[in-house]
């Protein structure tokens, strides 16, 4: 799970980005899953970044986990090594022009809160 902080309300790429692999839970209270804009700045999460990469026809792999918190930030190193290897082999080494999206949902899992304010993101990281 990660995000890009941008001084401005839109994420602007100076050039075509390198292939990216993104893992993110849609209930992350530490890092925005999509985007939050406030006072002329933006905090752009994995879902938003993946959408921009798709619009630019730039290779990426986005693994989204429904109802998952920031725990997804470390989980891929244990549970997704095959996907990481495939990403590195196909998109980085072989330069295959692929856009891959995987949505993981646990059947019967309860819905959790998914919308957070900028103040809540700051508090969860620094207070």
What is the predicted function of each stretch?
Residues 14-20, 56-59:
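Short, proline-enriched alpha-helix->beta-strand connector loops that line the catalytic pocket
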Residues 6, 28, 70:
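Surface-exposed, flexible loop/turn segments at secondary-structure boundaries
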Residues 54-127:
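C-terminal catalytic histidine-bearing segment of alpha/beta-hydrolase fold enzymes
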Residues 21-24, 28:
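Short beta-strand/loop motif that positions the catalytic acidic residue
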Residues 29-45, 72-75:
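Conserved alpha/beta-hydrolase "acid-adjacent" motif
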